[in-house]
Amino acid sequence: MNIAFSFKNFEPSEHLKKYARRRMEKMGRFFGKASGLEINVVMTADKIRHRCEVTVTGEGLHLNASDQTNDMYAAID
């Protein structure tokens, strides 16, 4: 399982990076042993909102989810 992170309009703290990685690894276990599983996470910060977009791709699998809120940790969840 490969996890790639992209950040737009802000510099993430180490704690945020670790938190996001833990959440994505936890989510990855729901896909079992899907081969070639890749998770792409894009986090964007604007003046009053934070957005997290997650794309999961694998063999015969393509999922996309996003959320926006005023707290990046809540958007990741």
Residue ranges and their predicted role:
Residues 1-77:
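N-terminal, polar/charged subdomain of small-to-medium soluble alpha/beta proteins
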